[in-house]
Structures are given as structure tokens and as C-alpha cells.
Amino acid sequence: MEQKWEEAEKILSWKEMQTGVYSYHGIERRGTNDYGRPISVVTLERGGVKKMFYAPASLYWDLKNRSETNFIKYEGTQTSAKGYDYPVFMYSA
């Protein structure tokens, strides 16, 4: 149990990402939330440092539907008409 807690501390919120380009190293599904949307963790690298982030559902589905992705560019957030912030990503092979 102790090991799982330490691992959880290393996983950051997607909201902690800095804008810019990251090398993509994979995404792992860890279950679903109360609304049936995937809870997943994405591993990204920037400046030689790998970090794990909880991925928004949109990122999970985008990456699962792409044949090849090597880089992800995080461009920040936009606000929906309902007032929710959501992330904006671009992808390249």
C-alpha cells in the first residue's frame, strides 16, 4: 500500500502542464470515473525529464484513435460555453 501512495504522489494533474512540446511515451488506462469516462495516466518528457500526468478523457481518446504519436503540444486551456475549462492539445508523428 505504501508503494501505491508514493506512486500517486508522482502523478500530476494535467492542469500542471506547461504550454509547449512534450515527447510522448504512452498512456495507460487506470479505470473509469463515475460518468464512465476513462481515468488514465500519460507519460510525457520535456527537457530530459519524464513526468506522469492524469490525462483528461479527451486526450485518452485522441491518443487511442491515432496510429502514431511522438510529440504532444499543450497549448493551454479554453473555456466551454457552459463555463468549463478544457485542455487544447496538438499531435505530431
Question: Each PLM stretch: what is its role?
Answer:
Residues V49-A55:
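A short macromolecule-binding patch
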Residues G76-A93:
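OB-fold/S1-family single-stranded nucleic acid-binding modules
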Residues M17-G20, S58-E75:
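Short nucleic-acid-contacting surface segments enriched for D/E, G, S/T with interspersed K/R
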Residues M1-V49:
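OB-fold ssDNA-binding interfaces and closely related basic DNA-contact patches used
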